[in-house]
Amino acid sequence: MNYLTHQLLNPKEINLLKKNLTLQDISWEDGKKTAGNHAAKVKNNLQLDRSSNISKKCTGLIEKKILSDVLIKSFALPKRIHGTMFTKTLKGMKYGRHIDNAFMSSGRADLSFTIFLNEKDKYSGGELLIEGLNSEDKFKLDSGGIIIYPSTYLHSVLEVFSGERFVVVGWIESYVKSIEEREYLFDLDAGARSLLAKHGRSDELDLIFKSYSNLLRTLGE
């Protein structure tokens, strides 16, 4: 399956987010508000009002981290981020099997991401289940961990049995919309960076970086 798991946020950043997002005057609303017609029938969670000042402040921190992360930039080739929101799934809640919308109001959704904010031992259940062609994979990461996966996959959030699941979700529009082409570019970039770290610059490596840049120029939008 074509996905990336990665530790994105450090403890200081996590604590800052939690401090801002646990203020008493924060307004949480029914998650169905932002779901498509089909997904709304199976969505049962809470989300922070995206128009609130606290949401905009925290969203800015998240999006800045994503767009400046070297590994994420290599994997996702992010052009822009759409629809970032903070969600809570309480005891008895879940988000059933669904597919994300192809387009948000601000553009195409190529990749979906979830950032886990509370430690996984603070709640039971609540795993993110992603369905590939021949397999199903469950994810429940440590606090600050991010998973990025193609928005073309069916997925769900399993029922929370105790505690609460607290995450950030959003969507990435990539410069390269093809899953396969992004994978080729990611492998080429990773291999070139590894060679550079081990052996330093060389004429041969310059040719590899040249090929990568020109492929990205050809495939990108």
Swiss-Prot record:
EC number from the UniProt entry: 1.14.11.-
Cofactor remark from the record: Binds 1 Fe(2+) ion per subunit.
UniProt keyword annotation of Iron present: yes
EC class (word): oxidoreductase
Domain Fe2OG dioxygenase: 80-174
Cofactor: Fe(2+); L-ascorbate
Annotated NCBIfam families: PRK05467.1-3 (NF003974)
Protein name: PKHD-type hydroxylase P9215_13741
Organism encoding this protein: Prochlorococcus marinus (strain MIT 9215)
Lineage: Bacteria, Bacillati, Cyanobacteriota, Cyanophyceae, Synechococcales
